[in-house]
């Protein structure tokens, strides 16, 4: 009836997990109690959970990403603390099986639920506004994609308290992830979390590809698209091509585990190296799925705070497209030690070095944009300059690892871990936080606090180097990844420094929380409010509408005649808002409960039941998912019109605020 599920699956004998569970329950009850006390359930359901508005979904994606940051960082600081303590005769405070689950969950959460969710949140808010669209191409799929991602994140966290998580790392290499070596439910939690979130991500890629190709404003040709939109397009193409490979790889691993197949086992004709090829054929494009949009963020931020147009727009676009193509030609550099031979290794090593060329072009373009510019060092520019320094170092170490001979020495060492975090934190996280600071006034109507934002940057920047430069050093000294104990006295001081770095990063996260609190508290101060909709003297269309934008984004769809049309119109004194124009009724999609209610619950039921072999319940969940999608397809009540009078009222109110601001 309940498959493998029993009371013994609840880890009551692990004090850390019991304490965590009690803390989660207390926080959960407090949050639910506050929502109930203030009577916000109806509001949250109608205006947020069922929303198909790309702007609200963007906010929910970013909230999900920040929650994932807290969980993923908790895992990170636990690992750093274990390695600071577990030296010589001291075993540390984490048993090996628990430590293995922590590093596996850390990687899974940070990539799939922090980085991917943050990226999708930025896409959702910015892309439709930058191309002059009123929504995305498929609003329901947008809602469904979010809830698939949220369900997968819930599934990962359920494994904390019911069963266990994978102990095989964030990519679940076989044969360790096969039944013989991982007979528990941990790998199954991993499989279904990745598969469900992968569905959401694939739908997102399709959605934004179609949105950018088909819904650009009149006159916005390919050569007039903002660079951030170009990066979103390239990332969407990468998603559509790469994520099916992940689905197949993890699906075949699931067939090994559930049906006794032998795709990746050491017997029965299986080949574990096939899994590595498949997972990294997805995995390296995934790195660029994450970092290319960060490049797009910097391509918007640097011109805005340098007071100049972006240097080398065409080369930026060509470089982005080159990186997109080359990202599929480098995956073997993750396992030069496989034994494919010198010719294969030489090809992929050279391809890896070549991909640094378009990346270098981007870096020089940003520097030339800043050159002789009127640079304003807002918090956004701190993150941008910090990225340029940090990502350059990460790129240099990447070129080192692209040399097969060097990789034979450094493979599977902490040098590799330091390089990976150098690119993901220094490139992806710095980029997304930069974008959050930049576009926050557009989202919320008020600026983020500059003082706390700069403090957060410095703690993150210094903490990052304290945490990961020591890993380069101990990697050179031979320390391999995934160790939970060591005896080498030369490593211990460096790992203590890394622990200090993790604490500094924790203070950086605390500063970011404080920044949010202070910004919300002081949102009505004149210097913080964004009445104009253009607080940074921006160049692209998103700054031409109010902050926050109305539900329809643009009362009149803009016409684009040049790159940076909005900036040119401002310089020429053209009224971009067309105040007083004759407005028309605007066609918009209706909110839906199909994705946020029925489909979400069914997917969660299916995933949990499949983990525990509760097949009757899994069938119920699967039928629920399929039935919900079919029912939604047959639903005709999916849109409505905003009356022209309502549009005029909203636009006139914004005009009144602008006039009042000018009078002040």
Curated annotation (Swiss-Prot):
Q: Where is this cross-link: 1'-histidyl-3'-tyrosine (His-Tyr)?
A: 284-288
Could you list the residue ranges that cross the membrane? 15-35, 57-77, 109-129, 136-156, 190-210, 233-253, 278-298, 316-336, 347-367, 383-403, 414-434, 456-476, 490-510, 603-623
- Pfam families under this entry? COX1
Domain of life, per lineage: Bacteria
Give the record's membrane topology: Multi-pass membrane protein
Annotated positions binding heme b: 106, 421
GO biological-process terms attached to the record = aerobic respiration; electron transport coupled proton transport; respiratory electron transport chain
EC numbers: 1.10.3.-
Q: Which UniProt keywords apply?
A: Cell membrane, Copper, Electron transport, Heme, Iron, Membrane, Metal-binding, Oxidoreductase, Respiratory chain, Transmembrane, Transmembrane helix, Transport
List the InterPro entries hit by this protein, alphabetically.
Cyt_c_oxase-like_su1_dom (IPR023616), Cyt_c_oxase-like_su1_sf (IPR036927), Cyt_C_Oxase_1 (IPR000883), Cyt_c_Oxase_su1_BS (IPR023615), Cyt_c_ubiqinol_oxidase_su1 (IPR014207)
**Which residues does Cu cation bind?**
284, 288, 333-334
Q: Where in the cell is it found?
A: Cell membrane
GO cellular component, as recorded: plasma membrane
Which GO terms label this protein's molecular function in UniProt?
cytochrome bo3 ubiquinol oxidase activity; cytochrome-c oxidase activity; heme binding; metal ion binding; oxidoreductase activity, acting on diphenols and related substances as donors, oxygen as acceptor
Positions of Fe(II)-heme a binding: 419
How does this chain assemble? Answer: Heterotetramer of the subunits 1, 2, 3 and 4.
Functional note = Catalytic subunit of the enzyme. Electrons originating in a quinol are transferred to the bimetallic center formed by heme a and copper B.
What family does the Swiss-Prot or TrEMBL record give for this protein?
Belongs to the heme-copper respiratory oxidase family.
Specify the protein name.
Ubiquinol oxidase subunit 1
Gene source species: Acetobacter aceti
């Amino acid at each position: 009836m309940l498959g493998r599920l029993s009371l013994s699956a609840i880890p009551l004998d692990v004090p850390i997990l019991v304490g965590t569970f009690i803390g989660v329950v207390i926080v959960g009850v407090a949050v639910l109690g506050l929502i109930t006390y203030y009577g916000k359930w109806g509001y949250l359901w109608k205006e947020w959970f069922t929303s198909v508005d790309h702007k609200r979904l963007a906010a929910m994606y970013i909230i999900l990403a920040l929650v994932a940051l807290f969980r993923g960082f908790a895992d990170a600081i636990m690992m750093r603390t274990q390695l600071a303590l577990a030296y010589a005769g001291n075993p540390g405070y984490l048993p090996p099986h628990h430590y293995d689950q922590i590093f596996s969950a850390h990687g899974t959460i940070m990539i799939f639920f922090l980085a991917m969710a943050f990226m999708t949140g930025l896409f959702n808010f910015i892309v439709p506004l930058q191309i002059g669209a009123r929504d995305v191409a498929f609003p329901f799929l947008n809602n469904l994609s979010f809830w698939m991602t949220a369900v997968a994140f819930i599934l990962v966290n359920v494994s904390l308290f019911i069963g266990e998580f994978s102990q095989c790392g964030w990519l679940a290499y076989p044969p360790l992830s096969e039944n013989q070596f991982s007979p528990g439910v941990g790998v199954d939690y991993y499989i279904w979390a990745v598969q469900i979130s992968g569905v959401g991500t694939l739908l997102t890629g399709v959605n934004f590809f179609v949105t950018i190709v088909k819904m650009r404003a009149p006159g916005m040709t390919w050569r007039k698209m903002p660079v951030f939109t170009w990066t979103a397009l390239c990332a969407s193409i990468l998603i559509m091509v790469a994520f099916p490979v992940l689905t197949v790889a993890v699906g075949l691993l699931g067939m090994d585990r559930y049906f006794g197949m032998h795709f990746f086992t050491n017997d029965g004709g299986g080949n574990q190296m096939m899994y590595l090829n498949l997972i990294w054929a997805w995995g390296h494009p995934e790195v660029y799925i994450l970092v290319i949009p960060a490049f797009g963020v910097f391509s918007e931020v640097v011109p805005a705070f340098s007071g100049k147009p972006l240097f080398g727009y065409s080369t930026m676009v060509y470089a982005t497209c080159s990186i997109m193509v080359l990202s599929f030609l480098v995956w073997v550099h993750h396992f030069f030690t496989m034994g494919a031979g010198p010719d294969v290794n030489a090809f992929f090593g050279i391809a890896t070095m070549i991909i640094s060329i378009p990346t270098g072009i981007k870096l020089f373009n940003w520097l030339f944009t800043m050159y002789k510019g009127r640079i304003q060092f807002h918090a956004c520019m701190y993150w941008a300059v910090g990225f340029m320094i940090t990502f350059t170092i990460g790129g240099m170490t990447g070129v080192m690892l692209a040399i097969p001979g060097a990789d034979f020495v450094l493979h599977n060492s902490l040098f590799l871990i330091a390089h990976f975090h150098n690119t993901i934190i220094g490139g992806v996280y710095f980029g997304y936080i930069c974008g959050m600071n930049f576009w926050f006034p557009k989202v919320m109507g008020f600026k983020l606090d500059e003082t706390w934002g700069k403090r957060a940057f410095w703690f993150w920047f210094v903490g990052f180097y304290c945490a990961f430069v020591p890993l380069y050093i101990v990697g050179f000294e031979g320390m391999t990844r995934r160790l939970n104990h060591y005896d080498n006295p030369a490593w211990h001081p460096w790992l203590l420094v890394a622990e200090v770095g993790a604490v500094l990063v924790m203070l950086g996260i605390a500063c970011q929380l404080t920044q949010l609190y202070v910004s919300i508290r002081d949102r009505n101060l004149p210097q913080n409010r964004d009445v104009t909709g253009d607080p940074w003297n921006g160049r692209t269309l998103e700054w031409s509408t109010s902050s926050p934008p109305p539900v329809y984004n643009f009362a009149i769809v803009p016409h684009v005649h040049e790159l940076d049309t909005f900036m040119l119109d401002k310089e020429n004194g053209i009224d971009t808002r067309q105040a007083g124009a004759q407005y028309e009724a605007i066609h918009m999609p209706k909110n839906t409960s199909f994705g946020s209610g029925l489909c979400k619950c069914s997917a969660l039921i299916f995933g949990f039941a499949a983990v525990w072999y509760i097949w009757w319940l899994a069938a119920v969940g699967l039928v629920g998912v399929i039935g919900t999608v079919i029912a939604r397809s047959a639903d005709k009540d999916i849109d409505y019109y905003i009356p022209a009078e309502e549009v005029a009222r909203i636009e006139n109110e914004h005009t009144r605020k602008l006039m009042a601001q000018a009078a002040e």
